[in-house]
Amino acid sequence: MRRLVLPLLASLLVLSPLARAEVVDNLYQVREPVTSQQPDERNAALKRALQVLAGRLTGNPQAGQTPGLASALAAPESLISQYSYDAGPPEVLVANFDPAATERALGQAGLSVWGANRPVVMIWWLNDADSGATLVGDGQPASTGVQRGAQRAGLPIRLPLADLNEQLAGTAANIDASDPTALRQASERYGANALLAVHAKPQGNGWQAQWRLWNGSAADQGSSQAADQEALATAVLQDVAARLSKKFVSRPGTTQPLTLVADNSNFERYAQLQKVLEPLSSRLVKVEGTQLTYNLTANPDQLQAQLGLAGLQPASAPAATAAPATPAAATPGAPVDATATPSAPVAQPAPSAQPARTTLYFRWP
């Protein structure tokens, strides 16, 4: 690998625009509320933390209930590199899980892992109470619950600054609309991949929200309920993560051996692509000019979605190389030497047991 990377450093070290997807910070860290630091409470919190992490790493909020994960849940401390307490309020146990051990446990349970490189979600969140409607802006007190919910769900997010122009855009009419044009225009400066509009209201002793999600040309919607605003944000964003993961996570039995050829690369793009391909058992096998060639195992459609986050676009395969000429057949009627000793048949090599690889071509613009 070093022989491949060294020429890559020399040939690709030029600047390029940053891709929009982001690596999720503290992906393997879970902050779980506790009522004390007693051993029984700690053990219960570690189990809950593993269940939260299983949902975050797979995009499936119910992954922590998978029967194959039972042995790991019985001894979650075996997957933890360290833990500590944060006095809060509220007091929480901060558990840092070992990535390799955790992914191995999930794999043994038959669960596929969503990599740390994930789409950025632009959130327009409107809290509508008796005192009036308030757009949640970045840095405002109400944004804390949304940020915590995003961390629990494993999503990188953006919130509007909520300046005057954005207040005019983030109205109930625009947030409830099925047409996202107004919100998309107001979101352009944030460079996000997906757009989420949430309208939250008090309901009984709790809160409920209606939300709409746009990811490229795909649209989705749903509703969530919770006891308070922070719990509501967690519920909404875990549901959104579950919807997004269907596009990016390869489920068991849907993958195949692939060869990926990525052209027009540079060093920065190479580094970004390495992060995208890390969960896919990828191996860099060739570097030629600005072209990178990888062998990997993935679902082709979900690989394309992941590559799109890194700015790669499908490309045409190069013109096929001309096939070698076949020996000319004997001319009809030509004399045959009947005294010649027939040549022994040449043994053919056994067919390779390696599965055929489909080659996919992509390039950066």
In which residue ranges do the predicted regions lie?
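Bacterial N-terminal signal peptides that target proteins for export
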Residues: 1-8
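Short, solvent-exposed, polar/charged sequence segments at loop or secondary-structure edges
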Residues: 65-80, 156-195, 299-303, 328, ...
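N-terminal targeting signals for Sec/Tat export/insertion, comprising classic cleavable signal peptides
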Residues: 28-57
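Amphipathic beta-strand/beta-sheet edge segments enriched in Tyr/Trp
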Residues: 28-31, 35, 187-231, 304, ...
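N-terminal segment of the mature soluble domain
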Residues: 46-68, 123-176, 273-297, 308-311
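C-terminal soluble interaction/assembly domains
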Residues: 248, 256-365
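Signal peptide-directed extracytoplasmic domains
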Residues: 62-125, 135-141, 147
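N-terminal signal peptide c-region/cleavage motif recognized by signal peptidases
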Residues: 16-18
